[in-house]
Amino acid sequence: MEVHNATSFLGHGGMAQHLQPVLESPFAESILALTPLQGIALFLCLFWGYSSLTLHRRIKVPGAPVHGYWSWLEPTWLLQLRYAKDAHKIIASGYKRYNVNGKPFVLRRQDLDITVLPTKYVAELRTIPNAKLSRGKANFMEWGDQWAMKNLWSHIDLPIKVISENRHGQQGKYLEAMRKEFEHAMEVEMPQVDDWTAVDIQKIIQMILARMVGKMIVGKEACRSPEWLDLAEHFTEDFVGASIIMRMLPKWTHPLVTNLLPQRWRMRRRLRDAVNITNPCVTRHREAREKRAKGIEVDYEDNMVGWMLDNAPDKQYVLDHLPILILIILVPAAHTTAMGISNLLFHLCEYPEWGAKLLKEINDVNNEFGPIGERLPAKDWVTKLDLLDSFFNESQRLSQPLSITPNRYAVEDFTFKDGLHIPKGALLGWVSIHNQIDPKIAPDPDTFDPLRSYRKRQVSAEENAKHLAGQPSLENLTFGYGSQACPGRNIAITVLKMILSRILRDYEFKFGDGQARPQNIYLLEFIIPDPKAKLMVRKREASVS
């Protein structure tokens, strides 16, 4: 058998001559003599050694200890490894040990540190401008960084404005457009079955939302195209998957790893393909504007692409970055809403006695005000569903998508009113699962109580306007808090109730024989429903044609 050494693979040219002294050095000979197992061990030692050296560069908030060590003997690299699967427990115990007593603590991830502040500081977020504590920059750090999100992110605030702006009633227009598309989505996506059938309900809800949200963002023609449906179904999966991987790696590895991830390859490809969606949208919008300017009626519904083109201070920037901008809107709009609906259905199957109560409320509202959108616009119709609102609040309390939210990035040095100093560059977060573990926030927190919010609203007229789904409060941080709370929360809650009021009226759901509520998956700060979970579904007898 022919034997090769390192130099035989370099040829006999100049490169081999230059490298010959290096390859023949005692150090190189020692490296080349290592077994594969020894080589892996050496690599890991160098990897974690360099990672440890970079820890001193992390921004430190005075008085905030690192939490999560088993003991003082545990090395930091082991804590960082454990954090991937134990984050939920570490966050909960840190809240009880420090936050309850008014003190901050630090979560030490592989890529960065998060300083977790007590809930008392949340109230100040209302008055702190984005220029000091930024949600946008925090999201950029959490969902990647300049390497992970290169060419896949835009710091322009136009996607936030297009969702939150309502000067000309465009939110109502968007909801009406989505309501119409919902009818088509139900016909295409929901199974028309009279007998109990096992279905992937999460996938079904995801695709219904992909069509509805697509109608709002890119319009009717685009939202039904195979290109859009593929983008909506798979881009978010790769986006979240890439983010999870990057969070589990030291930041110094990101420039190397970002180009090796298959998720990143697929994201880039779909971003290029998105041009085939946005270019026709731009053309249709331009043609509709020209005809309207001439007084010609056109069959064209306003959408978010058109709003951005009409209202952007730099139209050319929008044209150049439109695929990125629509994806920034799509990812949170469809993904988290689908999770919320799926979790509610899981809870309803776990507590089936509530099915008849929710159905009665839906039928009563339907009988009094007609079908949604007929006599009342969607945003007003769904406000009549008080019991469904409270049921969703409780379901979301126990199945939130993230255990740390809101987040803020310190753009500059900042000091809270009580003197807590936050240095520039610090990443801040709050424990959003506090209402799962703190009896002072939610009495008997382990109990599923669908009337928890409903009872609070009955106390007084003032309280009746509070404790609503999607309404940020010190007790409910799921949608953030303050002036930078989730801008699309009202649209999301309206769409969620729109979908649930229809499918609960038309369909029955239950677990399969021997099946219980699927367990959530905890990974880093993410709380994810079991993607393999299925439900049994059939059309209600009154709905069977």
Curated annotation (Swiss-Prot):
Keywords: Antibiotic biosynthesis, Glycoprotein, Heme, Iron, Membrane, Metal-binding, Monooxygenase, Oxidoreductase, Transmembrane, Transmembrane helix
Family of this protein: Belongs to the cytochrome P450 family.
Group of enzyme by EC: oxidoreductase
Organism expressing this protein natively: Sordaria araneosa (Pleurage araneosa)
Residues annotated as binding heme: C486
Gene Ontology molecular function terms on file: heme binding; iron ion binding; monooxygenase activity; oxidoreductase activity, acting on paired donors, with incorporation or reduction of molecular oxygen
Residue ranges that the Swiss-Prot or TrEMBL entry lists as coiled coil: none
Protein name: Cytochrome P450 monooxygenase sdnB
Enzyme Commission number(s) of this protein: 1.-.-.-
Pfam family, one: p450
Membrane-topology annotation of the record: Multi-pass membrane protein
Glycan-carrying positions: N5, N276, N393, N476
